[in-house]
Amino acid sequence: MTAVATHAVRKIFLIATEESGDRLGASLMRELRDRLGAAVRFEGVGGRAMAREGLTSLFPIEELSIIGLSAVARRLPTILRHIRTAAHAALQAAPDVLVIIDSPDFTHRVARRVRARDPSIPIVNYVSPTVWAWRPGRAKVMRKYVDHVLALLPFEPDEYRRLQGPPCSYVGHPLTEQIATLRPNPEEQLRRDAAPPVLLVLPGSRRSEIRHHMAVFGEALGLLQAQGVAFELILPTMPHLEALIAEALKHWPLQPRVVVGENDKRAAFRIARAALAKSGTVTLELAVAGVPMVTAYRAGQLEAWIVRRRITSASVILANLVVGENVAPEYLQEECTAPTLAAALRDVLADSPLRQRQLAAFGRIDAIMSTGAQSPSACAADIVLGLLPAAAPALR
C-alpha cells in the first residue's frame, strides 16, 4: 500500500460517463479517502455512485449513455460540447491527477486536450480500451497523453508491452470481489443440477442491443423447445429496460420468467445450468459463476462492417480471452441465426464435451484473475497515489 503525506490537500479529477465506470470511480474515491482522509478533494464527471461519495458532476452522465454509430451521430453536438466542458473544467481545476474511466471515445478526447494545454497533469486511464481486439495502433498513440493504464483484465499488460503502449498494470476486475454473489450455495447447486434445467437469456443491457438480439433469441429458444428440449427460462433485466423487454416478448413463442434488478440477476446465475448471452462483460460474469454459455452479437450493418474490418483478436468474448482459449462458442452477425443458436444451446445444456470444456476452463478463472490480498480499488489507488507530485500546495 502506497503511503502518502497528507499535509496538503490533493485534488483528483475523475471522469466516468457510464454506470460501470461510475461504480469503479466510486470505489476508487472511497479507497483514496481511506488513505488520505480530509486531505483529498474530488471534482469531475460521474453518476449516482460517485455522487454518493461526494462528487458534484459537471453534467448528467445519462446524456452520454449511448451506443452505436447512428446514436452517436444524432448526439454529436451534445457529446462535443461535454468534451469541451470537461477538458476546460479539468484545466481550471489543475488537479494533482486526472483519472479517466472507460468510455474512450469521450474520455480520451478530454485527456488529449488536457495534455496539450497542461502536460504537467498526470493522466491515469482506468479500464483499458480494447486495443487487443481492434485498432491496436491506439496503444502506441496513448503514450502521448496517458501516463498509466489500470487494466481490469489480466492479459492486458502483456498486450500493451507488445503494442508499445504506456505502462499498464493489472489491478483486478471488480467481479473478483463479488464471487460469493455469483456462485451457488449447496441448495442452489442442487437446483442447478436438477430438471428441468434453468436456462438464462441475456439479450444485452442497452436498448439498441435488445432491439438487435431479442427477435433471434426468441426464435432460437422456440426452436429448442420444439425439438423437445425441456428447460426453465429466466430473463434478467434492469428496471429501465423492463418495458422494452415486455414489448419484445409479445412476439416470442414462449415466455420466460423475467427478473428485475442486480440481486435477482445474481440469484438466477446461481441456479442456472446454461445461458444464451449477448457478448460483453456478462460473459465474464457467467464464467466466474461457472455457467456454460452460447454467445452472440448483432449490430447495425454499418457498425458491423467497420468492426469486422478492424477486429484483430481471435475472439471477442471476454470469457474466452481471460481463460486463454475459445471454449464458449460465439456467433456474430450473419452467423447469429436461430438454428445455429438452438443447436449450440442443446449441446451446452447436455453433458457434452462443449459443456465440459467450458467448466474446466472456468475452474481456472480464480487463479487467473487473482490480485492477491488487495482489492482492485486498492491496487488502483496505489498507482494513482504513486503519480501524485512529491509535494503540492495546500490548494490550487
Curated annotation (Swiss-Prot):
Keywords, alphabetical: Glycosyltransferase, Lipid A biosynthesis, Lipid biosynthesis, Lipid metabolism, Transferase
Chemical reaction(s) catalysed: a lipid X + a UDP-2-N,3-O-bis[(3R)-3-hydroxyacyl]-alpha-D-glucosamine = a lipid A disaccharide + UDP + H(+)
Name the record gives this protein: Lipid-A-disaccharide synthase
MF terms in GO: lipid-A-disaccharide synthase activity; phospholipid binding
GO cellular component, one term: membrane
GO biological process entries: lipid A biosynthetic process
Database matches in HAMAP family: LpxB
Alphabetized SUPFAM superfamilies for the sequence: UDP-Glycosyltransferase/glycogen phosphorylase
Matching PANTHER family: LIPID-A-DISACCHARIDE SYNTHASE, LIPID-A-DISACCHARIDE SYNTHASE, MITOCHONDRIAL-RELATED
Source organism: Rhodopseudomonas palustris (strain BisB18)
Protein role: Condensation of UDP-2,3-diacylglucosamine and 2,3-diacylglucosamine-1-phosphate to form lipid A disaccharide, a precursor of lipid A, a phosphorylated glycolipid that anchors the lipopolysaccharide to the outer membrane of the cell.
Assigned EC number: 2.4.1.182
Gene label: lpxB
